[in-house]
């Protein structure tokens, strides 16, 4: 499952097709859809100017058929992207997903359709402990991660709820020893 927080608050958009979610992430996944089936869980605030409108969400569901999209409404807590990722992970795991791709809504996925298989294979080699990630214009730390539900089983969340937003990437980069970090810099996940 891909888990993606998204908001249209504070943007000069009037339609869902103007969003980063539509124009960047979903279009790139549609163009270079991974070779394994995926479900994308999108977390949005119940009072979001665009996503809270059912007809707007249905536009996206109608335009993208290569993958399933599930919209998860959240209680508004502006700036707390960590809570959204953690809640989306709960939903995905409850529905039987083992692997969680933690992404932003403005990411372009790799053009290699097997990138997700490569990430999963690397995690399996480590008994699904740690993470796999691509390169996201940051040579110091990874910022978009594939985790197995084992991470949730151990910690109870993807990111510590106290973080809210800043330093959540740093947490995942620092929590695991190097041998459990599968940083595949040849696979670009760019924004």
What are the residue ranges of the model-derived segments?
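Active-site nucleotide-sugar/metal-binding loop of Leloir-type enzymes
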Residues: 86-99
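Short beta-strand/loop segment that forms part of the nucleotide-sugar
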Residues: 36-49, 72-76
